[in-house]
Amino acid sequence: FASDMLSINLITSAIAYILFFAALAIPKLAGYRTLMLLFSTTIILSTIGVEWLYNIYEEYQYITIRSFIFQIISVVMLFTCVKSEDDYMIYALTMVISSVGSNIMNFIRARKYVKFKLRISKKLRIHLKPMSYIFLLDVYLVMDRSMLGYITGDDTEVGLYAAAIKIASVLTSFFSALYAVIRPRVAYMMERDEEQAENLNDLTARLILLFNIPMAIGMFCLSRQVLHLFAGSKYLGVTSTMQVLMLNVIVATFNSFLINQLFIIHRKDRWASMGVVIGAVTNVCLNALTIPVYGKFGAAASTVAAELAI
């Protein structure tokens, strides 16, 4: 299984690099080529990092300590090396550093569990169906920013929207970590004790209700203060957009639970993929209607509507 997963990831990484280098030829991106090349290292690094292997073996202590160490290194570099707006390449490097260190350490340590063999076999097809959902989800998650930039042609508008998205993602990442911890155990228990698996699902749902809604409401009420604290006064114009995205946090978190911890584990991959497709189509249609009129606010509202459609 591990060799199959690594083989698939290497194939998809190769395809990603082909598309990436084709994108570098676009004249509009000429000024960002060096920056894009730097960030492109994360494609191969995330592949050889085999983070999924450590989730399977529930090595959460190792994941936490490793992530903490490299994040500290990244933050120290950020505050000591980045002095002005002209240091954006150094800033990008500090973001990549944590990924480089974590993934290289993962790959070296993975030999403790498995011996990887690159191979292309008929068994790979078994994994393609559930992985298609992940691909669709990744495309869906960047659709709003891509369309906002394409329709408005305003980098400032996209930057403001990205700041709001980044702050909102802090909340969703909390629950993503929760799913990463519980999901392997639920999948394991489904084959041995279905009642225990359902109890874990019930616990997850209760934790979402306990933390998700209060956190989103609190951030909704304090959006202006949070933006001023973490992004600066220049970003206060995105306050209403961020408040809309807090509504999206509530809906998206429940969707993620339903899809990743219920549909996928119960082998309802088709339902998961269908939901993402419906959300993507809804998002594209509404973005086309709202972004020309409302800009970033329209993109945020369309994202909420798309999550509700899912």
Where are these regions (language model features)?
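Interfacial segments at transmembrane-helix termini and the short loops linking adjacent helices
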Residues: L24-F39, D155, M219-F254
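Helix-loop interface residues and adjacent transmembrane-helix termini in multi-pass membrane transporters
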Residues: L29, I56-Y57, S84-E85, I151-D155, ...
